[in-house]
A protein has these predicted regions:
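Surface-exposed, low-hydrophobicity beta-strand/loop segments enriched in small/polar/acidic residues
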Residues: 1-124
Length: 124
């Protein structure tokens, strides 16, 4: 289920698979696939992705986007990027791209409500 409200055209800093969490690239206007929970992620690649560096890529920046799940996820959990740009559950002290709209397991394509933020440390 998706409801993409805001898409931003960027250039790929490297190949980006479809439905992957992305972060800013090395230059303005470029995006690369997310690689860690500490990344400053800003959206999710669309169904086309990008096959090589400098290819155009549309990034879903607002609304509900389809995203590749990289672990077991329960709807409502905050999601962050694993090493492959797939969605995994964000824990204390990690950044997140948004919240799961549906439950799923690794290999599923789920949905994320895009609302970037940070999970505070316990007691913070």
């Amino acid at each position: 289920m998706r409801n993409e409200l805001f898409l931003k055209a960027c250039y790929a800093g490297a190949a980006i698979l479809p439905f992957r969490i992305v972060k800013h690239g090395a230059a303005d206007g470029f995006a690369v696939q997310g690689a860690a929970a500490a990344d400053l992620t800003f959206g999710v690649s669309d169904s086309m992705g990008a096959t090589a560096a400098n290819d155009p890529v549309d990034i879903v920046r607002g609304g509900i986007a389809e995203v590749a799940y990289g672990a077991t996820i329960v709807r409502g959990q905050p999601l962050t990027s694993d090493a492959n740009g797939q969605a995994v559950v964000a824990t204390a002290g990690q950044r997140y791209i948004g919240f799961a709209e549906v439950s799923g397991v690794s290999g599923d394509r789920g949905s994320v409500f895009i609302a970037p933020g940070y999970v505070p440390n316990a007691g913070a």
